[in-house]
């Protein structure tokens, strides 16, 4: 096999270059035609049944309202009961014919089976599955004392989506429905203190890309990679190395700094349009794509910049990171001109 690999190593770059010069322009023209058609004839989700996990806040909440405005039946899932019922009531006011709130923990296999089956039993079908539930562990890998405390990142962010997809896929095949996987820009771009979060989102992207090859046209899959969106996460709610959820505004200032925080409403509108067009991917905001290109072609540069900006040094507190200092300067500047702070 080694000689064959040597031949492929020599020929494949040449064939790839030729294909890019000859095939790629035609491919892009065809994609443009398909894109125009999808924009002219988007999917109508009125009357369709949609399951949204992590629906009590953030992107999940905003998507519930967007689907509701378009007349979809909703099964909203979250582990937090009170805010979930509030979102369900608002989604009906926005126009959903019927909303079923379901309190469940997506990290538990039996809970996922229960709410998928409850949805199908109640509404008689399932058309869209939005896997949105997630947590953000935020700490340095070397600071971990008990590695088992890191498991919620994979249990919720990755396995929670896998469990839902496992039980929903037979019904989605019947309706030729769609999975909307809410991943993250961190699934493509590494960031200090987010090792488990980045890993879980990268796994999610790879999982759904593989399912595309298995499901073919039976189930559509839209993989969404948002940037920093206004949510509990962007406001400083993180999972500590002990597995507890806490609000840490100082750590939030270090990690988010002056990055533009997109409103959940704007992000949800972009996702909704992308889903109705049948897009395979959505980067929201689109400038994330430029960062990914920098990572592909200049990975050493992007990694060095991330380390320099977000790491304070071995003997310094985390609040001494350059990102925090940049934020302090920006807020001082905005105070001088009486502008709202970041």
Predicted regions and their residues:
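Conserved mid-core segment of classical short-chain dehydrogenase/reductases
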Residues: 121, 136-151, 193-196
């Amino acid at each position: 096999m080694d000689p064959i690999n040597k031949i492929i190593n020599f020929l494949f770059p040449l064939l790839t270059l030729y294909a890019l010069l000859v095939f790629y322009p035609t491919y892009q023209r065809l994609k443009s035609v398909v894109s125009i058609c999808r924009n002219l004839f988007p999917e109508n989700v009125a009357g369709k049944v949609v399951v949204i996990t992590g629906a009590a806040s953030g992107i999940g909440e905003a998507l519930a309202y967007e689907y509701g405005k378009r007349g979809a039946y909703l099964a909203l899932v979250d582990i937090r009961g009170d805010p979930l019922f509030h979102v369900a009531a608002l989604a009906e006011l926005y126009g959903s014919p019927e909303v079923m709130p379901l309190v469940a923990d997506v990290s538990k296999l039996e809970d996922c089976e229960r709410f998928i089956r409850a949805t199908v039993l109640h509404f008689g079908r399932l058309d869209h599955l939005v896997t949105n539930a997630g947590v953000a562990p935020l700490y340095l890998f070397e600071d971990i004392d008990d590695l088992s405390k890191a498991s919620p990142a994979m249990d919720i962010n990755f396995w929670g989506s896998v469990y839902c997809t496992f039980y929903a896929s037979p019904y989605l095949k019947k309706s030729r429905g769609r999975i909307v996987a809410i991943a993250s820009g961190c699934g493509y771009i590494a960031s200090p203190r987010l090792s488990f979060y980045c890993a879980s989102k990268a796994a999610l992207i790879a999982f759904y890309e593989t399912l595309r090859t298995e499901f073919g046209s039976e189930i559509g899959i839209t993989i969404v990679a948002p940037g920093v969106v206004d949510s509990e996460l962007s406001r400083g709610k993180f999972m500590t190395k002990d597995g507890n959820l806490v609000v840490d505004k100082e750590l939030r200032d270090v990690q988010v700094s002056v990055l533009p925080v997109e409103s959940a409403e704007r992000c949800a509108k972009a996702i909704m349009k992308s889903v109705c067009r049948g897009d395979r991917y959505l980067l929201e905001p689109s400038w994330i794509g430029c960062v990914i290109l920098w990572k592909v072609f200049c990975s050493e540069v992007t990694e060095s910049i991330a380390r320099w900006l977000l790491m304070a040094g071995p003997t310094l507190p985390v609040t001494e990171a350059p990102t925090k200092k940049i934020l302090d300067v920006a807020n001082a500047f905005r105070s001088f001109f009486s502008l709202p702070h970041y």
